[in-house]
Amino acid sequence: MSSLVKEDLEKKLFKPLSQNLYEFIEIEFSVQDRYYLCVSVTKKEEVKIVMVKHYRIGLDEKYEVTKKWSLNDLQMIDGKEADTDNPFFDLHFKKVYSLEAYSCASKYAFARTVNKLNHAYLKKDLQIVNFDSTYINDDSIWSSNNKDCLVLMRICFYAFNLVCLSLCPLPL
C-alpha cells in the first residue's frame, strides 16, 4: 500500500515540482484527513521537508502541501524518549512542531532518511536526540534499506536472546 501512495505522491506532487521523493511517513495530525511527512530533494540539491494533506474528491486522490521547510532550517529532531516504543517526536525549526508518526518504526525511518540526506547534501551538525543511535546511523551493523523492518529485526534479536537465557539452567 505504501509503495502505491509513494508512487502517487511522486507523480502528482513531487515530479511536477522537479523534486525526488526519498521518504514519506504517515503522521497523526487530523481525524478527518490523512497527513504525510515527506523528505525530498530538489534539482538544486536542496533537501525539503514537506507536510502533505491527502484527501479525496470523488474517486480522485488529491494532495496539498500544508507546510514546507528546508533541511537547512532544521535544528534538531527530538524522539522524546529513546527507551520507550512511542511514535512521538518534535521537529525544531524556528518553531517546535510536535508530531505523532503512524508507528515508532516510521519515526525512525524518517529520522534515518533526514540524517542520511543531511550527511549527503549539507553536512551540518544536525542534532538527533532521544533516538537509539544504533537504528539511526548507517555505519551500524543493523542499518538496512528495509527501513521499517529494521526495528522489528532488532526486537526479534533481543527476544531470541531472552528466550535463550531463560532456558539456560542456573548453577546452584
UniProtKB/Swiss-Prot annotation:
Q: What is this protein called?
A: Exocyst complex component 1-like
Quote the Gene3D superfamilies the UniProt record gives: 2.30.29.90
- CDD domains per the record? PH-EXOC1_like
Pfam families found in the cross-reference section: Sec3-PIP2_bind (PF15277)
- Annotated signal sequence is none
Q: Which organism is it from?
A: Homo sapiens
Question: Gene of origin?
Answer: EXOC1L
InterPro entries of this UniProt entry?
Answer: Sec3-PIP2_bind
